Amino acid sequence: MLLKFEASSELRLVDPSVSLTVLRKIRLSHLPDMTMTSESSGKKCGEGDGKVAGKSQRKVGLVYDETMCKHDTPNGKVDVECPDRIRVIWEKLQLAGVTQRCVVLGGSKAEDKHLKLVHTKKHVNLVKSISTKKKDSRRNKIASQLDSIYLNGGSSEAAYLAAGSVVKVAEKVAEGELDCGFAIVRPPGHHAESDEAMGFCLFNNVAVAASFLLNERPDLDVKKILIVDWDIHHGNGTQKMFWKDSRVLIFSVHRHDHGSFYPFGDDGDFNMVGEGPGEGFNINVPWEQGGCGDADYLAVWNHILIPVTKEFKPDIILLSAGFDAAIGDPLGGCCVTPYGYSVMLKKLMEFAHGKIVLALEGGYNLESLGKSSLACVQVLLEDKQIHGSSETYPLESTRRVIQAVRERLCTYWPSLDASMASNENLKNPSAERNSADALLREVEELKSLMAARDGELEARRKELKAKNKELEANEKELEAGLMLIRAREDVICGLHAKIESLQQERDEAVAKAERIDKELQEDRARSQEFKEDTEFCLSTLRREKELAIMAKNKDLEAKEKELEARLMLVHAREDKIHAKIERLQQERDEAVAKAERIDKELQEDRSRSRVGNGSFAFSQEFYEDMDLDELEPLSPEFNEDMDSEELEPFQVIKKNMERSHKKFIKDMECIKFIASERARVL
């Protein structure tokens, strides 16, 4: 079967037994270029005003924010999902002059309450906390527990911007402020599930936008949303979030390889059609192998997606625009061209009044990514009718998959059942067009194209003749100029000699300059070496000085501690001395009191001695001045003259005086000792 993609964007089935013979006689160079060209190229564009050279254009919104490039691998290792993905797209659009004709919007951060419409609170908090976990090791630990995820300090902000930007564009399109839009965002989102990040995806951007329109903006009257996912990988996260929701029709065409292609398992199988109210509203078209191209995708569009979309009648279309099915993608292994993407998008724009929002998902070949994105934006702008041609067949596995999907879903979508007979077209290439008239019309179209090209060639011939006349006139001018040149040859010869001498002088000057430069470099090297030595010496001196100061400080601290210890000893000794002084004062006071008591007793004894017998009277002054050692014993004669009874009182008095005197002497010595000790201490 031969699939021909014509300017009308229709998929036409051509009988290879007839048309190949004709088409091979006509070189494809006679057909228009497959890439879309802008009618306004070379004309001045008004930036973001939606008008080109006075012609009204669709209002196309573009979101790009360089902040999303901060999301990168923490160790600088190159990954396929890299910041250059969105940079390449933006540069491609700028070079083509497309950004000036669109409404350029900055990024917008998503609100937590909108994210929690499809994600759990725990997951939202985890992504938010990534930026606060300052150590990469902690982020790496979190990433290691997830599937195909890397994180750095900018990941959280980029994820919030990606989700919020898709919400922003979708809201403006639903409001009618924009006709359509393309959110050039990263990280992608269709793998992210309600409670888990995976497959490069942190938040499910498209799912957040769809839930926002349905639940947060009922005033926009968006009741049915079609989510188309043409990324080469199955959008497992989006499928699970709307598994039971009949308001959202999810259509995903992807590589499945019987469950062995990422994200693996049976989630992407065509039997996964939804559950409960959402049964029949989840459509998976799983490729059995790689190598699928434009013909395969457009066959799916014509035989499954377009009929179902006509029945569903969406109010808005959200497109998970992954370009990893493009030619040369390192992960996809398929070969969709920019032309193929543009035709698929053009067909979708026939629904929902053209209200369609593209959100970037995958795509890891930078060249294919840029070209495919540009082709899609040009379709959004409705630059020009799509031109192109491709002589390719859908794979046999594509026919099997389309038939299996239609049989599985025909109970939910009558249009698939009603057109089952047309499925035979996939088996019989000439079923749609088996008449000679159709072939003749095609040949006539090709002839008209060739006639137009012949007209262009004739115009070129006329231009060449005019240029030949100009060349003849120029030749005459050149001959006149040649004569002038010959006249100046002599002057030039002299100048050559002078130039040679100047060149020689210049060479000598250059050699001298090189020599001087070499000497300067040597001087700089020596100066640098001297500088390094000086700095080393200074640093050594500073270090030694610091060490000496530290040693001196230690000595001072030791001395200070020693002085503090001595001071403590002095204070202790002073306390002891004060205590001893107090004790001595107490003893002195006691001795004085004792002396006073003794003196009182002596006075009493003296008074008794004066009145005892009345025979002798001794004055107090005599007693105080008397030295008992000078008392001589009574003379024998005196003893003989007195009776023993008369003598007895005198003897008693003498003994008492001797005893009191000795006691007084002892007390005085004690008082003197106390006084001397006190004087010594003071």
Swiss-Prot record:
Binds 1 zinc ion per subunit. GO terms for biological process: chromatin remodeling; regulation of epidermal cell differentiation; root epidermal cell differentiation. The keyword Aminoacyl-tRNA synthetase does not apply. The keyword Transcription applies. Responsible for the deacetylation of lysine residues on the N-terminal part of the core histones (H2A, H2B, H3 and H4). Histone deacetylation gives a tag for epigenetic repression and plays an important role in transcriptional regulation, cell cycle progression and developmental events. Histone deacetylases act via the formation of large multiprotein complexes. Required for appropriate cellular patterning in the root epidermis. Involved in the differentiation of hair and non-hair cells in the root epidermis. Is not directly involved in the regulation of the expression of pattern genes. Belongs to the histone deacetylase family. HD type 2 subfamily. The record marks Y364 as: Polarizes the scissile carbonyl of the substrate. Its cofactor is Zn(2+). The active site is at H191. This is Histone deacetylase 18. It comes from Arabidopsis thaliana. Keywords: Chromatin regulator, Coiled coil, Cytoplasm, Hydrolase, Metal-binding, Nucleus, Repressor, Transcription, Transcription regulation, Zinc. Residues 59-382 are annotated as: Histone deacetylase. InterPro entries: HDAC_PDAC, His_deacetylse, His_deacetylse_dom, His_deacetylse_dom_sf, Ureohydrolase_dom_sf. HDA5, a tandem duplication of HDA18, is not required for the cellular patterning in the root epidermis. It catalyses: N(6)-acetyl-L-lysyl-[histone] + H2O = L-lysyl-[histone] + acetate. Its EC number is 3.5.1.98. Zn(2+) binds at D231, H233, D324. GO terms for molecular function: histone deacetylase activity; histone deacetylase activity, hydrolytic mechanism; zinc ion binding. Its main location: nucleus. It is found in: Nucleus; Cytoplasm.
